[in-house]
């Protein structure tokens, strides 16, 4: 893969690109990284590359030097990426996609940004490495190169590690252990010592799911949502469907205080508390019955529920989420794409609720 970096400070990249895995990949010609100084395309005697914006504020990179620099290295198969906090978030999935490209041109942001006309004319995609602002786009460019290079065959000593690493299946990696078996009174989990590979794989998945739920609810929500999309039945291979009809489903929710839980659900979903007793059904959906069972806190089992809501519009979906928070529940994460909106919430007893609403086509 060839990568051209366009920056005001090409010397910034010398150290990272000459050491460790990236340095070795460049020496082995798995990566061909070239640096271009934007100032070489500056205007006038002083090679001016920036100017004051018409809207006021800090300096901007001018359109002409930027477009000239890009066009000097652009080929027919090039993909131009502007590293910007306004771009789509860099993910493992996006890194894998970019690794399939033959030529990337990375435009590093400087000052307060770049004249929009240069972006509209030359940039194929804007990418961000997170919701924060850096001193220059060179840092972001290095992050992208490092993330992408892992998926280029031969860059890693063991390519399988790229597939197994954290985030590759949408989850954080779980805890890992090495010798000794016991350290300061803490022992390695017994399941890892028994040699049962199936049990170990199951344990690792469970630990990854738990850690992701606790530390990155946004990733956990996306993981569950994508998994629900992937788990579809093949109409042609599914037989005797008529023999497996379900009239009603009952879900038991263990709660600390029955009255408190009942009041919460009734207020959120607009139900009559007097008629609910210790069970309730959601409005317009009578096939699922939620039973509330009062238990002691230490004996309570936490469950995760996923509900696809039939709302008239996205505003109605957001209204439900506001009611959830208003009456004491927690809204942990909310995401959206062109197909759906979904949210991860937590009720008063710690049960996880995944609400989704699919946009009409």
UniProtKB/Swiss-Prot annotation:
Its main location: cytoplasm. It catalyses: guanosine(37) in tRNA + S-adenosyl-L-methionine = N(1)-methylguanosine(37) in tRNA + S-adenosyl-L-homocysteine + H(+). It is an enzyme of class 2 (transferase). Keywords: Cytoplasm, Methyltransferase, S-adenosyl-L-methionine, Transferase, tRNA processing. GO terms for molecular function: tRNA (guanine(37)-N1)-methyltransferase activity. Its EC number is 2.1.1.228. GO terms for biological process: tRNA N1-guanine methylation. CDD domains: TrmD-like. S-adenosyl-L-methionine binds at residues 109, 129-134. One of its GO terms (cellular component) is cytosol. InterPro entries: Alpha/beta_knot_MTases, Glyas_Bleomycin-R_OHBP_Dase, tRNA_m1G_MeTrfase_C_sf, tRNA_m1G_MeTrfase_TrmD, tRNA_m1G_MTases_N, tRNA_MeTrfase_TRMD/TRM10. Pfam families: tRNA_m1G_MT. It is found in: Cytoplasm. HAMAP family: TrmD. PANTHER family: TRNA (GUANINE-N(1)-)-METHYLTRANSFERASE. Specifically methylates guanosine-37 in various tRNAs. Belongs to the RNA methyltransferase TrmD family. Homodimer. This is tRNA (guanine-N(1)-)-methyltransferase. It comes from Chlamydia pneumoniae (Chlamydophila pneumoniae). The lineage of its organism: Bacteria, Pseudomonadati, Chlamydiota, Chlamydiia, Chlamydiales. The gene is trmD.
């Amino acid at each position: 893969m060839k990568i051209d970096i366009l920056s005001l400070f090409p010397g910034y990249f010398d150290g990272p690109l000459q050491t460790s895995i990236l340095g070795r990949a460049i020496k082995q010609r798995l990566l061909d990284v070239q640096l271009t100084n934007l100032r070489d395309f500056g205007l006038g005697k002083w090679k001016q590359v920036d100017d004051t914006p018409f809207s006021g504020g800090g300096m901007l990179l001018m359109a002409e030097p930027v477009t000239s620099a890009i066009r000097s290295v652009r080929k027919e198969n090039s993909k131009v990426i502007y590293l910007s906090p306004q771009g789509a978030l860099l993910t493992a999935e996006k890194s894998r996609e970019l690794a399939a490209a033959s030529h990337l041109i990375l435009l590093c942001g400087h000052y307060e940004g770049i004249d929009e006309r240069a972006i509209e004319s030359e940039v194929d995609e804007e990418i961000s490495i997170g919701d924060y602002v850096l001193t220059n786009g060179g840092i972001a460019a290095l992050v992208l190169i490092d993330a992408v290079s892992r998926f280029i065959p031969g860059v890693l000593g063991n390519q399988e590690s790229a597939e197994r690493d954290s985030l590759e299946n949408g989850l954080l990696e779980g805890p890992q252990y090495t010798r000794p078996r016991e350290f300061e009174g803490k022992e390695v989990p017994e399941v890892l010592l028994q040699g049962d590979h199936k049990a170990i794989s199951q344990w690792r998945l469970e630990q990854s799911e738990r850690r992701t739920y606790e530390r990155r609810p946004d990733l956990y929500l996306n993981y569950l949502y994508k998994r629900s999309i992937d788990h579809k039945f093949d109409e042609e291979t599914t037989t005797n469907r008529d023999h497996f009809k379900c009239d009603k489903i009952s879900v038991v929710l263990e709660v600390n205080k029955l009255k408190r839980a009942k009041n919460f659900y009734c207020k959120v979903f607009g139900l009559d508390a007097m008629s609910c007793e210790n069970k309730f059904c959601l409005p317009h959906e009578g096939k699922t019955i939620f039973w509330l069972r009062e238990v002691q806190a230490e004996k309570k089992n936490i469950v995760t529920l996923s509900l696809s809501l039939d709302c008239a519009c996205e505003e109605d979906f957001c209204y439900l989420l506001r009611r959830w928070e208003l009456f004491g529940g927690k809204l942990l994460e909310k995401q959206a794409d062109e197909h759906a909106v979904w949210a991860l919430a937590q009720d008063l007893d710690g049960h996880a609720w995944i609400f989704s609403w699919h946009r009409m086509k």
